[in-house]
Amino acid sequence: TPLDSLKYYKGFLHSGFVCMDTEMGDVKAYVGDIDYSHFRYDMAGQARRQVGSTIKPFLYALAMESGYSPYDLAPNEQVTYQVGDQEWTPRNDSQSRYGEMVTLKWGLAQSNNWISAWLMNQLSPELLVGLIHEFGVQNMSIEPAMSLCLGACEISVLEMVAAYTGFAKEGMRRAPRFVTRIEDSEGNVLATFVPQIHHVISRDAAWKMVELMRGVMDGGTGSRM
């Protein structure tokens, strides 16, 4: 029945995947969904979903641009922040090193929400929104809220992958390039498409971000990879 068909197709897990070359921005692989003949909504480029902790490198990049160092210290403790006429108390999964002063590098490596909230309070949600847009994210409805530092916004897979190229290439973001050139049947080049490169953060801040993000893989939440 039509109802059975709806239930069947609603049971599928949908996802998107993008692989980019950080040198030129060439898109090497792009998967919009399971099967275009049945699912024509592009989960990689059209769909925007909450990004969670993948937003944190942008917060730390803002901190590095503002003069912070990966080895600056922050209090690892739960704090209640006054946001307008409301209170916001972020939670954290781990109690490791609770009450200690820890480095920002440790905070990102452990994806610690308390350190992110502390940084957000030292900086500005408005500045973070501005930097996210500088990194190529086109969602203009991102709210400059404290909870943004924990991923309370929606970004597409394509936007996020392209944005991360700014960390890999010394602060120079590559826009996605799907076509390098167009030729006719005789091999004559009709059009070429040069890489679109945009400056997003300073070279110094980018190097600091490489140091910070390396910690995620060396001894943080990504160490199992």
Segments from the language model and where they lie:
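A penicillin-recognizing enzyme superfamily signal
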Residues: 1-21, 30, 36-41, 55, ...
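Short active-site loop at a secondary-structure junction
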Residues: 9-15, 38-58, 71-76, 102
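Structural recognition of the beta-strand scaffold that forms the well-ordered cores
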Residues: 16-20, 28-30, 72-73, 106, ...
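Secondary-structure transition/capping motifs at alpha-helix termini
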Residues: 22, 37-38, 64-72, 138-140, ...
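Solvent-exposed loop/turn segments at secondary-structure junctions
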Residues: 23-24, 34-38, 50, 79-82, ...
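Active-site SXXK
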Residues: 24-25, 48-76, 107, 163-167, ...
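Conserved catalytic neighborhood of penicillin-recognizing serine enzymes
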Residues: 68-128, 173, 185-210, 214-215
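Mid-domain, small-residue-enriched loop/turn segments at the edges of structured enzyme/sensor domains
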Residues: 88-92, 123-162, 171, 175-178
